[in-house]
Amino acid sequence: MEKAILITFLIATTSMVYQTIGQEEEISPISPESLAYEPAAAYEYDHELLSHMTTRRIKFLQDCSDKMSSKCNVEMTEGLIDDKPVSEDCCVNFLKIGRECHEGLMTFVFATYELKDVASAILPRSKRMWNKCVETTAAKIGAPLAFET
């Protein structure tokens, strides 16, 4: 009995203090326009970036990307972020895709919305990484060209 009185007292007190709780709330329907999906800025930016590329260029970059092993992709990404050298095996894989592929992929990837702000720091690192691989590994596979420094 005491518990029921306490609960009634708490509800009555709360209803007086917070009068909106004690009143019925009018529920209005939500307009479909307010739920319309609007693409994020990143999507729009990257879509615009791709729209300026030819199908041939997109295919070229896709083929370049397919030539890199996933292990070396991870190692190179970590190397670019941490400014560390990559293994000899990944240097070989890296150099075999060719300078044009490397340069094209780096330019494209770091033009995307998420990475465009770090491009000025990362692109020079990618050139240093390429040059270091040329210096240490190129003689074993034929001599790709180094980037100008």
UniProtKB/Swiss-Prot annotation:
Keywords: Signal. InterPro entries: DD11, Prolamin-like. GO terms for cellular component: filiform apparatus. It holds the Pfam family Prolamin_like. Mostly expressed in embryo sac cells. Restricted to synergid cells, especially in the filiform apparatus of mature female gametophyte, via MYB98-mediated transcription regulation. Also detected at low levels in egg and central cells. Residues 1-22 form the signal peptide. It comes from the Eukaryota. This is Protein DOWN-REGULATED IN DIF1 11. It comes from Arabidopsis thaliana (Mouse-ear cress).
